[in-house]
Each structure stands twice: as structure tokens, then as C-alpha cells.
Amino acid sequence: MTIQYENLTIRQAEAADAKQLAAWWNDGAVMAHAGFPNGLGITEEEVKKGLGGGCMVIEEEGRLIGECSYRSVGDGVAEIGIKICETDCQNRGVGRKILSMLIGWLFQNGCSKIILDTNLRNKRAQHVYESLGFRKLRINVDAWNDQLGQPQSSVDYELLPTDFNSFAM
């Protein structure tokens, strides 16, 4: 699967991407929002073994800048995730476009609902999700502990095709 819009590409992650994915996933600054302020401690070989399915990379003008994923959770529902890992690509609307590309593709390919969750502290992500039409379902207060044992809260969202505001048209 490859999705393109303007200078952005979403494509299936390949073995050649494993080195960069491992670097991002081992970077606490990149992974803190997901509960791993010390990174995952994963090897390139472990990343290679886990590739496939809905693990994708994001390119801007051919440069790897992040990753996203989706998985079917049944009944036409897909759960998605995204990380714009390169800081010089953040706060420029890239994430909103990438999400629009991925969500549009999922809706065109039979999904009837998209779900996701994000850390309650990640206000930037919440703003992006809500601008795309996601509806906040619930806040899960102190629902889990990060790798340092600190309680974390999350926000659950859902998006229906009729509510979707695409930024990749």
C-alpha cells in the first residue's frame, strides 16, 4: 500500500527502514507520549521481525520523517496511530495531512469507523484530531503507568465518515 499527496508518502515499512524506526523507538523524547520516556530498548533486528501488517513509514520528499499504523479491531473499525518523529517536521500541518491521507484511504477501503487514543497531556494531538472531526468519547484518568511508574491518563476518540474533515484534498 502506498498513499501519496503533494510531497508526502505513506508506505509499508520495509526491512531497510528498521534502522531508523529503531532509532526513533529508542529515543525517549519521541516515545515519552506513549509511556516510554527511556525509549523501547529495541534492536534493529527486533524491528525487522515485527514489520508487516499496518506498520507504515511517512516520507516527505523521500526523507523518512515518522511512522503510522492501523489495525482492524473488527466490525469495520480500525485503530490508528501516528508519530511525526523528526522535530523539524512538527507544527507545520504535516500530521494533519498524513492523518487525512490514512483516514481517507481507510474509509475508501471499507472502514466505517476510526478509533484512537492519545495522552491527556498531548493537547497538540487532541487539537489535530478534533479538527479532523474526531469526537472525544472519554477520558481515562490514571489508567496506566509509564515505564517510570508515573500515572498517565488518556483520551479515547472516534471518527465516522460523515464527520471527517480532510486536509488532503
Language model regions located:
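Helix-loop element at the rim of GNAT/NAT acetyltransferase active sites that forms part
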Residues: 12, 23-38
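Conserved catalytic-core motifs of GNAT/GCN5-like acyltransferases
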Residues: 115-118, 130, 135-153
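Short glycine/proline-centered loop/turn elements that form peptide/ligand docking sites
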Residues: 95, 99, 121-125, 142-148
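Active-site acidic-Proline motif in GNAT/NAT acetyltransferases
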Residues: 86-92, 120-121
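Hydrophobic pocket/interface hotspot
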Residues: 21-22, 80
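Conserved acetyl-CoA-binding loop-helix of GNAT-fold acetyltransferases
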Residues: 91-108, 127-131
